[in-house]
């Protein structure tokens, strides 16, 4: 079965990778794209997309009603991703969203919308399979190492901090680790924020520098030993195998799934 796909933000770095993914996948069809510019034009007329025939829409609702795609891929920004996820579900399109910034209330509202309309949705803080495995391994380790800190490193154009992956990792660890304050009980910061932000007592540190793509290490400490679990995305192509899996899986869902780990076998 051919899956008809709309991609939001095709000119962005992640959007370009998503377009390339659809083009090289036999059972995927690029039905249209949503962009801030070039309404009514064709993607093939834009630099870097020669030969890729897809109408461009600036209005998501008009795109969904006229094109009637099966799936929306949105790897843009938190604000845009939230808006597109809700619109897609309201118009019978299955959203696959790779942006962060969704609150528990957002997830609850979108889950209700997906179940009301009996269609699937997938939201994942990270589509890199290696990153998902890192989170799984961190959760396993937290049963035995209760002292832990997270360091996430991203390019300097990332809009949110900490990353959705870091927050998701902390949430998974907190499920199996008793809440505790780490470090010396009388510890004081001589510079505000020196110990990072904290989720349920787990310090999270965010680094933003040119040259990075997406990286995270989870450092556990115990008596006489440490354990570090690290994942590095060296190229944005690292996310595409997870996007492909999500697009294929969402066609068979009737609810929202948050996190790629829930669809990995």
Swiss-Prot record:
It is an enzyme of class 1 (oxidoreductase). PROSITE patterns: DAPB. It catalyses: (S)-2,3,4,5-tetrahydrodipicolinate + NAD(+) + H2O = (2S,4S)-4-hydroxy-2,3,4,5-tetrahydrodipicolinate + NADH + H(+); (S)-2,3,4,5-tetrahydrodipicolinate + NADP(+) + H2O = (2S,4S)-4-hydroxy-2,3,4,5-tetrahydrodipicolinate + NADPH + H(+). The active site is at residues 154, 158. NCBIfam families: dapB. Belongs to the DapB family. This is 4-hydroxy-tetrahydrodipicolinate reductase. It comes from Geobacillus thermodenitrificans (strain NG80-2). The lineage of its organism: Bacteria, Bacillati, Bacillota, Bacilli, Bacillales.
